[in-house]
Amino acid sequence: LVAQAVKRHATAELPRHMVPDVFMPLNCLPRNQSSKVNRKRLLEVVGREWSMQPMSPVADEQVDPAWCIKHRPLLEKIQGVIKIMPKTLSRSTTLSELGVDSIGAIRLSSRFKNDGHDISAIQVLDSVTIEDLNNHLSVKRQGTSNWKTLLSRYLDHWKPLVSRHLARDPAHFSLVPTTVFQDGMLVETLRDPMLYWASYSWRLPSTVDIARVRQAWQHVSKNHDILKVSFVPTAYFEQEETQSSGPSSMFIQLIDYNASMDWQEIVSDSGDWQQSIQAVCANLQRTQHENNFSSPPWRVTILAQQDQRIMNLTIHHSLCDGEMLRSLMHDVAWAYSTAELPVKRCQVQEAVSRLAVRYSEPEGHKFWGDMLSPLVSQTSLGDATSNSPKAVVRKIRHRTTELQATRSTSKLTGLARRLGASSLSPLFRVTFGIMLTEYYEQQSVLFGEVRSERLLESQLVGAMAPLSATYPVPFRSSGNIKDMVHSQQILVMDSIRYGPPQPSDVRKILKKSRDEALYSAVYVLRQRPEDDGGSLAPWEEFKDIFEIFVDHEFALNVLEGADDTVTISLSVDETLMSSSAQAIFLQQLDALLIAFDKSAPEISLSGLNAHFPLDLLSIASSKVSAQYTSTVPPSHYIETWAKTHPEWKAVEVATGFLGSQKIVTEDWTYKKLNETANQVANLIIHASLHGRAIAVSLDRSLIAFAIIVGIMKSGNTYVPIEAGLPNDRKSFLLRDSRAAMAFVCDNNFDGVELPPETKVLDTKNQSFIENLSTQDTSDILNNYPENLDAYLLYTSGSTGTPKGVRVSRHNLSSFSDAWGKLIGNVAPKSLELGGVGKFLCLASRAFDVHIGEMFLAWRFGLCAVTGERLSMLDDLPRTFRELGVTHAGIVPSLLDQTGLVPEDAPHLVYLGVGGEKMTPRTQQIWSSSDRVALVNVYGPTEVTIGCSAGRILPDSDTRCIGHPLGDSVAHVLAPGSNEHVKKGMAGELVIEGSLVANGYLNRPDAKGFCDINGRKMYRTGDIVRMDADSSILFLGRKDEQVKVRGQRLELGEVSEVIRSLSPTDIDVVTLLLNHPGTSKQFLVSFVASSGAAVRGELRWINENYKEINNSLRQACEQTLPAYMVPDFIIPISFIPLRDTSAKTDAKALEHMFHTLSLGELFGESSSLVNKPTTAPSRDLTSIEKQILTVVKSVVGQDDKRDTRPRSTLFQLGLDSIASVKLSFKLKKLGFSTTVARLLQNPTIEELGRMKNALKESHDAEPSNSESITTRFEELEKKTMNSLKDRETTHIESIRPCMPLQEVLVAHTMSHGSEADNAYVSHMIFELDPAVVVEHVKAAWAAVVKNTELLRTCFIDRENDIVQLVIKENHATPVWKHLSNGTNMLKEELLSCKKEIADDIVTNIDKSPPVRFTLASCDGADETNEMSLFMLSIHHALYDMVSIEMIFQDFEVAYTDSSLPRRPSTLPLLEHIAAQQQNESKAKSYWTTLFDGYDHRIEKISPRTAQTTARTLNASLTTLESLCSQTNMTLSALIQGVFAYVLARTLKRPDLIFGVVLSGRSIDVEGIDAMAAPCISTIPQRLNIGTDGETIAELITTVQDRLFKSMEYQYTSLRSLSRWLEISGPLFSSLFSFTKLSPPEDSGSSKSRILKPTEGEMFLDFELALECEADPGTDTVTLRTRSTMFDKMEELDALLEQMESLVTSFTRGENKAVDGDFGSMLHTRLLPPHGSLQEESDDWSVLEQQIRDVVVAFSGALPNEVKRTTPFIKYGIDSITTIRFSTLLRKNGFWVSGADVLRNPSVAKLATHIQTTSSFNGTAKDSDNEASEPAGIGNWSKALLAGAVSTKVLDDVVAVYPLTPLQAGMISATVMMDPTLYAHHHPFRLPQGTSIDQVRSAWSRLVAKHDILRTSFHEINQPRPQLVGAVHQ
């Protein structure tokens, strides 16, 4: 009775939607200690004593006792779940009345399942009443047999095929189709191996038994089929697939009954266990990707690290969803504790088959097509026919925040029921949808809802299978709230019936390109998981360890808690909004739910704001409580300073900018300005003018300032008219403003049609000057109304007619005060600069900023300084510096163009920027200044110059325009309405306050000024967002108004003018567009004949372009201001319109503009649009036809499609999904293709070339193997004959060198033992004390015997260098042993490098150039210190791949394991020989490549070597994905960027550089395991002028050129030098690309014997850059070493520019190639070869003698040898130089091979010999070989002559040669580091020690030991070397 009475009262007093559903009388409310209601206790009472009257119309009907007795079990189950008394239920009671939601349905279905009823949670939800539910339970179902029948048919079809394909017994496996969810994830993972993997980690206490953990996992994996699942692509079964039974899918799940668990245990020394786990995950990801998921994609890892143990599960999402994971870990915990499983669970075969039975694929496809097709954008261009490079799909990093919903679960459930929903899902769908539509500014959005399919069948609850699915949620924001919720309720139920669609189907329906995310947002509603045995688990899970990357911007997770609470978690792309904005978004979502609850169900969206908190709406409240009391006139501050500081400068004009002289200026003080302004005012007043418009069109002069102020003092309105405007525009402004007077000069009104009422005064006319001088100078009394117009400024109009904006005196005064306070705050020094500071007046008079510049200067007592605008801009740094500018306002583009930096403006304290977006570079430069306050300024003319501003910091968003100023209030309203949008949502900015101008002149039709709720405001038309702190973010324009070069214009005005100027009727559309070829924006007008049919192909009418563009642009220049003249006027076939709105289709026009090249637009080339985009038409080759057949089998037949060799796969209909199938099918035809490789080669022709390239690589093998074998045999025979005087029995084989070996060894032989010891590397390793030294030696002996190259030495034979391979039994490693104290061990090892290198170089023809050194501490056994091992090896024996193989072999040999036999290098040498047989083809290719290249660029003088590195911000995965989509390799991308940046840095538009190739991509048997230096180095060319207009085109050219060059990669560099007649190096810079091998499992890798500590590489190039791609860390690192630059900053800048270009690529930008190289800064050109010295017949004796040696060596005739002709022409190259230099020495010329290479002509070599005094005369006796002096007798102090001063020479008593150790240390100290080898040994002197005696002792010691009296010097005779000089 009480409940009924309360209910009646509530119904009478409350609106219907606020009447509670349930009334429960209690004697009291339970409370806790804080007197709050104890909700937990209350719920217990409710559960025990719940009573209720149903709210249905039959609530009062009598309950049928017989029916209740019959169905008591049903009612009791409902009572147990719903907490309701059975006696209150009737058969007509609805489940929605009872609050049965999705969770309750699951619980009910589960209870019915336990009683044997087969009913799903969906069927429970589908029941309207209890009787409906009973009817469902009464039906006997045949589901079990149905799914088993389906599975049986599936197995019958697929199992034989799979068995045959895998050659496996069908009894050992079973199959099941994949779900939609699994298919989609597997396809995406094949595209990117890092996607859709999950990693979970748990901390294992010390009490956990690892063996039992493993047993538990084994038990679980044995009993759950999902953990035995691998995947088989259906594409393997080409023909059979079309006949398959069951659902179509990309993969088949294979349940392998014999699958073993992937378990590993790792002991890691690393301190970062997360990094170790990441390495484990990365290894599994790569392995699975490479093997196409042919084994179960999961692994358990136990990581033992220091004092903790971690258990990690890495698993692919195709095997596991969140609910299954909880069940899985519950079972593992149970198995660990009890050795049993808790329950029998539904397995994957049954689960997937049950789902398959439910759905009809055709019906589902039709349903989703109907639901989603309305969302297709009518302007979507898709990518099916596009060949343009795509932006890389961005991987999004989420930031997550959460809050507890204000309303409880029960409240929200009741709300959902009132709005027509059976669960919370439709309610949150609508709430989230509304927020998204507002954020994206769209009426419709599509997002995804992730739901568990376990609801569909009661048997699926707890199933061990991934049963999640993503359902599309199309949402349209229209109608009232109840309608929207109801439509989503219907969609939920329908989607359950039809099932989830394939992601590929959704993409096709929506016409989304492969680069677009399918869903921009994802929503999940779930119940907080209960403890499923978690208490049994003895381990604790880590939360949120790894960064997760996704492809959707928003994710909303709604969690229903067991305590009647709802937690809302929002994850957002962290680049999309700030954390504060994200928090506001979440609060607004919660507030929206509250507003739903407070409002009537039929309320519209706009009505909800009434229930929204103001702080969540976009209102920036005024910071000033009241409006300014406008008591001061605009001239107030001028008059004030004139009285208080009359001598201060007020205005200054620069009149002279000549040459290097200081800028000439003239100025007025405040007193003079004020008096002159008063004279002007009186002159006007005497003309009886008041409140009239007065025009000013003057130059930048002192009188102009006075006239502007004087007009305002006189109570009239200033009308600025820019002198450069067309006459028609000037005339219009005079007429429209009804100007009574116009101040002009320099005849700038000649030809202007003047209105009769306008009186023109020429300020330079003598009569005006005299009249002005007679006027009174006293101040004018200010008795004018505040709202009187101060100035009238015209802006552009959309109808072609400019609009005059009336700005009042009060507006201008308020502006001065508001901005004065801002500037005083951000730049407080401004308050101290009165009389000193200067405000630069740079703005045009057509721009209202020029008024702000003047009046803000006078606000602070500064001087307004100006001058001729172009002269100031011509050298802006000079302007700032010499004029002493302290304050300025500049558009950002001007800062970029002039390159102005803070250092150029030493006096500047304030810089205002606005009108354009600022570039990041400019922002960083200026915002980082401690002296200058950088402020972003915003304000339409209608709101008095500027109404909002914000300080710009280095990390600021440059779109932020700060906060409203003064008493301004900013409102952000929904466009076209007076309703505020939510904070963070886009809307139109509306300004209120004293800055809002009076209005427009003569334009009652003009929109903008408005009255809202009785308050005057201005609608700016700008679309903005208001952030959480009320700062405003500028997004763009809502209309056609844009800003060009900082000035606002309306695009419609430009279009209207063009239309009026055209001689024929045309339609015009004007847009502001970006072009992919440049970062510049263009104003573009599209024109078409009026009435042109809007159908057919939209095309550019290029034949009329030049005429129309030129004629109409010239006409515009006569009519429009310069900034309004279009850059291009493009004729097109018709103006495209949108189907939905009939508005101009701007996207289609933008797309067309992007297809036109800059050359075409500027008239520099013919049309590319109407040219065929492919090569001349030809028939497909047989291979191409074969490829096309396979492609059609994947994408379907289309007879209408014209297929050509250059047709792309995407044009043929292939998408990312179908490419997976295509890759598998092509593999069966012999193509080695991956999905990524297909995307890199997207044309039929390119795929055919891949096949041909594979074939050609086979064909490149010796076509005449016998001839090559014979040639090798002849080489061996001749070499053996020449070695008769040597012991030859120990030689195993003789072989030619590889091209790079030849160069390296020749360099070594020709340079002898010079100090650098080129191409010898020393690698130092630590040996653990436990390592046995003798075992190390034995291991190396085994490795040397097993490796040919380590048994190879080199000899010079005639014109070649050959390899001598020593027999295994004679190959003994050469060891050196060192010992020293622990502190000096490494120094001792380092000091012997030079000696070892000399030994290698000297004996390279006798002993393999490899040495082994062992350094151990004295008494190492007792000290337990580590020993050091050094491997010294010549580069001719290894590359980075082979040296790693050698070290691996050593590790194996040390453990006494048998070594794998390394393949012989003979097949590689034969392959090279076969490639070199066709020399003419190689010569033709390389000479063509170098054709036109100027080789005269002088080598840059070497600087000190600089080394630096930089890791790119973009990850390796991101870059590889980018390259995959833009048809380029990562190597080509970095190489092209390197070449371009280097060319720009060196100012060389035509650049040759070297590229290192691995040499292991050729088809040679055993090449991968060959321990040999397979690398090759080839030259590449970059020509900025011809290789492409954009960076992408340039990189593509570089890639294509490299691809072609690889065919000739083994061409020897000496041959190239000979063909090109180049004596010096072909290139001075080198690029190499290395991709590291994936890291090994740290569990499988043992501790290595050799632990590297130090290594070195010799640098023989001015610049060497290595790009290292590391999959283990997912990074790309650039490492470089150079002698090219003076400063490290220059080298760092080169890498920074490279990263900048790469980063721009990741953003989808394609920058234009900058071809402006200016002057040659770093290089100068040498004269052409042969003109260094004039050729003449006057040969010196020395030159004649050298010529005779050349003739004797080459066989040339004496008259054929020229003085300056390079030696290369006579066959003297890097190899033959060795013999030539020997011949020279035999003839008395002491020169080395290196001397000849450095001086490669007769004239140069003669000069060198004369300079170094190395000529000893011609030796008549061949026995006199002019050998190097030997013996101490030849070492006299005379050798120092010329090297030291005479004074020093007199002090020297002896000269001696240095030991190798001394020479090495001195060289290193001089060349590398002056502190090297300098040691300081301090001693403590005991008390009483005599300092004099100490000094005497040292003096005697120095006198006794000459080493303490030795200095070191470099001499050049008889060869360059270091010597020691002993002093007296």
Curated annotation (Swiss-Prot):
GO terms for biological process: amino acid activation for nonribosomal peptide biosynthetic process; secondary metabolite biosynthetic process. Its EC number is 6.3.2.-. Residues 177-460 are annotated as: Condensation 1. Residues 65-141, 1178-1255, 1740-1813 form the Carrier domain. One of its GO terms (molecular function) is ligase activity. GO terms for cellular component: cytoplasm. Pathway: Siderophore biosynthesis. The keyword Phosphoprotein applies. Disulfide bonds: none annotated. Residues 1297-1706 are annotated as: Condensation 2. Induction: Expression is repressed by iron. Pfam families: AMP-binding (PF00501), Condensation (PF00668), PP-binding (PF00550). It comes from the Eukaryota. Disruption phenotype: Leads to the accumulation of the intermediate N-5-trans-anhydromevalonyl-N-5-hydroxyornithine (trans-AMHO), displays sensitivity to oxidative stress and shows deficiencies in both polarized hyphal growth and sporulation. Changes its interaction with the plant Lolium perenne from mutually beneficial to antagonistic. Residues 640-1045 are annotated as: Adenylation. The modification O-(pantetheine 4'-phosphoryl)serine is found at S102, S1216, S1774. Keywords: Ligase, Multifunctional enzyme, Phosphopantetheine, Phosphoprotein, Repeat. Residues 1855-1920 are annotated as: Condensation 3. Nonribosomal peptide synthetase required for the biosynthetis of epichloenin A, an extracellular siderophore that plays a crucial role in endophyte-grass symbioses. SidN assembles epichloenin A by activating and incorporating three trans-anhydromevalonylhydroxyornithine (trans-AMHO), 1 glutamine and 4 glycine moieties. Trans-AMHO is produced from L-ornithine via 2 steps involving a L-ornithine N(5)-monooxygenase and an AHMO-N(5)-transacylase that have still to be identified. NRP synthetases are composed of discrete domains (adenylation (A), thiolation (T) or peptidyl carrier protein (PCP) and condensation (C) domains) which when grouped together are referred to as a single module. Each module is responsible for the recognition (via the A domain) and incorporation of a single amino acid into the growing peptide product. Thus, an NRP synthetase is generally composed of one or more modules and can terminate in a thioesterase domain (TE) that releases the newly synthesized peptide from the enzyme. Belongs to the NRP synthetase family. This is Nonribosomal peptide synthetase sidN. It comes from Epichloe festucae var. lolii (Neotyphodium lolii). The lineage of its organism: Eukaryota, Fungi, Dikarya, Ascomycota, Pezizomycotina.
